[in-house]
């Protein structure tokens, strides 16, 4: 996945969930749109480098969108949650996900389930049951390279696990796919200490046959500037 042309600045602060102030190299201070409603723990530390895209849409109140954080330790974190589904769709269509490479058709945003949900991707293949894939953007790095999800309690995430478990029980394929968008993460676990109910439902879903996958994003740099990101390598669970 190619990034739009990116510029950078130094993070001053994130506030009101959707906004962030940064300082540009020329000394100008600007406000960005932050496309991430989560806690963003470890992703929004003052002094980190922010990489942002710029829209030419004159109707936008804030023309700039926060795409990546480059931490002072040198890690890159994709904070634009919309990129997770774009990455996974590209990986599915290019057959980079070995466990799902047999599926020829990738349908995004399909309605399903008894709780009025939308699945991120419905996969179809000849002579195979349909496969329902729910994507979770993962950016929380705890310690020793361990990444975790969720970074806050998530009733929506709990609903998705119930829906996936019901799909698996019906005889169809169900997958929860953790897109690891922090280059410092080397392995993955569910954050039981943050959301015990999510962790319990996660174990129940696995026991009903829901498959768990975690793949790590790779950032391609050109002269130190992020140019592209792809999702080709699995992450230890």
From Swiss-Prot:
CDD domains in the record: SfsA-like_bacterial
UniProt xrefs under Pfam families: SfsA, SfsA_N
Signal peptide interval: none
Gene3D superfamilies for the chain: 2.40.50.580, 3.40.1350.60
GO molecular function, one term: DNA binding
Source organism superkingdom: Bacteria
Family matches, as HAMAP family: SfsA (MF_00095)
NCBIfam families documented for this protein: sfsA
Family stated for the protein in its record: Belongs to the SfsA family.
Protein name: Sugar fermentation stimulation protein homolog
Species this chain originates from: Actinobacillus pleuropneumoniae serotype 3 (strain JL03)
Origin organism lineage: Bacteria, Pseudomonadati, Pseudomonadota, Gammaproteobacteria, Pasteurellales
